[in-house]
């Protein structure tokens, strides 16, 4: 026999909007755990095409940075491409459902940073490069550690004004 699976309404997959600083903290905490494991799996499972997409997203951030733009959407797309390369649709779906919350956090981090914008952009892109290189080299442990470090540092930049 055959059966039909009905996909849940997209509204079901949306998280509650960020309504406080505590919500932003919780989102960072959640992302640290989800995205670091996704990066680990992406390093082990990515296809050459997925790696090319990850690199393309990284390059788009560089291009936006050169134009001195915030690159929030490009940054989000890089993270999304990494979850897609994990080849587990749950990681991708969760990150997709957090789109607005993640962008709010990224915008706040960029706008509240005490660092000079160019310096901050370079640091963030260096963190991204560490993740991309680990995924390219299929080093799951290093990819996981690099993603965890990246999200933790973003949280520190926002809440503590540190690098």
Kindly label every feature range from the protein language model.
Residues 27-109, 127-130, 145-156, 161:
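Conserved amphipathic alpha-helical segments that form helical-bundle/coiled-coil interaction surfaces
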Residues 1-2, 10, 66-67, 116-119:
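Short secondary-structure boundary micro-motifs
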Residues 6-8, 106-113:
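Short regulatory "switch" loops immediately downstream of catalytic or recognition motifs
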């Amino acid at each position: 026999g055959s059966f039909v699976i009905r996909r849940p309404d997209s509204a079901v997959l949306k998280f509650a909007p960020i309504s406080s600083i505590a919500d932003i903290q919780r989102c960072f905490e959640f992302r640290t755990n989800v995205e670091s494991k996704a990066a680990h799996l992406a390093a082990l499972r990515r296809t050459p095409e997925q790696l090319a997409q990850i690199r393309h997203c990284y390059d788009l951030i560089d291009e936006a940075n050169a134009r001195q733009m915030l690159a929030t959407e490009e940054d989000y797309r890089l993270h999304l491409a990494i979850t897609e390369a994990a080849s587990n649709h749950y990681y991708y779906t969760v990150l997709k459902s957090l789109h607005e919350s993640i962008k709010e956090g990224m915008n706040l981090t960029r706008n509240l940073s005490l660092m000079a914008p160019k310096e901050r952009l370079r640091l963030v892109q260096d963190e991204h490069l560490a993740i991309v290189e680990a995924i390219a080299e299929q080093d799951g442990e290093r990819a996981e550690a690099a993603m965890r470090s990246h999200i933790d540092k973003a949280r520190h930049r926002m809440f503590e004004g540190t690098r």
